[in-house]
């Protein structure tokens, strides 16, 4: 029961909060009580599903409880089983990497089926991590010969020549999140050897200009901070037998005022083009601390209110 209830009963406390029920353990049996019969039935169904996953060796945590409740409310609880059937990749320590939400599963499927995939969504949805996992899997299966990871160094204005140190020292602060994910999947020593052989390349976006990248799995991270010109330049680097994943969060644009995000434009321009997928993740796909999900929802609601207020003010001026 400890694995089901979680540390300090956090899993069951969260289930109580989400479904407005009371859960207790009496004589070795789990008892669910509440004012709503539907809520009680839902909580019981979620608990049965979580227990079945535990019996299969899966780990139950608060992130999984949130996903299970969300699926239960949509009448899709049984789809939770399929999330654990597909191992995206394996870390160098042998831990399987799986999708944790339906949105993540659709994102991974889109990457598999398309040459170019845009992963759009807030922080904590696994956009970059899952793209990295897919890249490593493609490299191990010899579908590609190398991995190219890049992101715009917007904080430095891409004028890296003014910073002290060699190229690696200049760009490392901007590329550290990509290194972290790569180290977890391949191990630091393996990554270093692969970089020395050119199998893995990590570089700022400015260094992609003038190149054609063939037989490669290419990831552009933090793409909301590309300009329109940079995005077009990057997308036209694609060579034969390559796959590109572009990730970003349009709500976190750090470009100078007046500069339009290349990611925002690309999603509009390329929507509907064959072999290009645009996969949007939401707060429901956030798999970090539950407070992150609440923060994302709050900011989304604030942005919506601001948009409505702006629209109302503009309509008033027109009148």
Predicted regions and their residues:
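Hydrophobic side chains in well-ordered alpha-helices
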Residues: 4, 42-43, 231-234
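Residues that form generic nucleotide/phosphate-binding pockets
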Residues: 4, 46, 68-72, 83, ...
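P-loop NTP-binding catalytic core
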Residues: 74-99, 104-105
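Short amphipathic alpha-helix segments
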Residues: 2-17
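A short, structured beta-strand/loop element
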Residues: 16-24
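Short phosphate-engaging motifs
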Residues: 11, 39, 288
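Conserved helicase motor core of SF1/SF2 NTP-dependent helicases
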Residues: 29, 92-104, 110-220, 224-319
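Interdomain "pre-motor" coupling segment immediately N-terminal to P-loop NTPase/helicase cores
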Residues: 24-84
């Amino acid at each position: 029961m400890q694995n089901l209830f979680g540390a300090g009963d956090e899993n069951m406390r969260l289930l109580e909060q989400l479904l407005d029920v009371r859960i207790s353990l009496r004589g070795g049996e789990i008892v669910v009580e509440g004012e709503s019969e539907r809520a009680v039935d839902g909580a019981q169904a979620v608990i049965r599903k979580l227990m079945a996953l535990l019996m299969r060796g899966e780990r139950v945590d608060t992130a999984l409880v949130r996903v299970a409740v969300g699926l239960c409310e949509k009448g899709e609880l049984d789809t939770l089983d399929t999330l654990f059937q597909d191992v995206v990749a394996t870390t160098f320590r042998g831990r399987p990497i799986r999708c944790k939400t339906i949105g993540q599963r659709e994102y991974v499927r889109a990457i598999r089926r398309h040459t170019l995939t845009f992963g759009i969504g807030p922080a904590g949805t696994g956009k970059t991590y899952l793209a990295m996992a897919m890249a490593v899997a493609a490299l191990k299966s010899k579908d590609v010969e190398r991995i190219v990871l890049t992101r715009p160094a917007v904080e430095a204005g891409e004028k890296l020549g003014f910073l002290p140190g060699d190229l690696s020292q200049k760009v490392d602060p901007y590329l550290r999140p990509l290194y972290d994910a790569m180290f977890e999947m391949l191990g630091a020593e393996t990554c270093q050897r692969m970089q020395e052989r050119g199998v893995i390349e990590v570089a700022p976006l400015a260094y992609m200009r003038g190149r054609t990248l063939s037989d490669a799995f290419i990831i552009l991270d933090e793409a909301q901070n590309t300009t329109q010109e940079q995005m077009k330049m990057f997308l036209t680097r694609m060579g034969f037998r390559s796959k590109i994943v572009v990730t970003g969060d349009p709500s976190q644009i750090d470009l100078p005022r007046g500069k339009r995000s290349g990611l925002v434009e690309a999603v509009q321009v390329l929507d509907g083009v064959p072999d290009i997928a645009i996969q949007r993740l939401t707060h429901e796909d956030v798999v970090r601390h539950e407070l992150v999900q609440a923060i994302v929802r709050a900011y989304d609601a604030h942005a919506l209110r601001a948009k409505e207020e702006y629209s109302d003010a503009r309509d008033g001026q027109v009148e």
